[in-house]
Amino acid sequence: MCQNKINTNNTMTIKSNKKLSYSVKKLLQKIFKQQQRVEEEQNLKNALKANSLESLESMENSRNADLESASICASLESCENEANERLSQSCEIEDYDFEQLPTVPVHFVRTAHGTFFWTAVSDLPADNDLVEPLYCSTSNAIAIPQDRWVQA
């Protein structure tokens, strides 16, 4: 009888231990599952943030690519080329005889303070700058020397 009681006590203890370990195991599983869910949610949020940043970057890249695309650049270049062609067609290029144009001598001197340039128009004959010098009365005055200088 004692043996039966001990066996019964042992089986009850084993059953209670099994129940206790089972409940602890269930509790730990719930805790681990909850922790896993929290981590998965955080990973999902982080992935969404990364995707949104990547999508923003890809949108910006595609926008820049569109701006640099050949169609836009080509249209701008074609507009510019057309404007240049129209301008060149509207302007008639005339051949100038440079022998008739008076030359203005440019003098220069290099010093420790820099290089100085100046022009002297005293070499021009009287009334040479007039359109029709015969009809103007300037008494054939000699041009006043107008020296201009600049430091380079």
UniProtKB/Swiss-Prot annotation:
GO terms for biological process: cell fate specification; negative regulation of Notch signaling pathway; nervous system development; Notch signaling pathway; sensory organ development. It comes from Drosophila melanogaster. Disulfide bonds: none annotated. Pfam families: ESM4 (PF15952). GO terms for molecular function: ubiquitin protein ligase binding. The keyword Thylakoid does not apply. InterPro entries: Malpha/m4/m2 (IPR029686). Part of the Notch signaling pathway. It comes from the Eukaryota. This is Enhancer of split m4 protein.
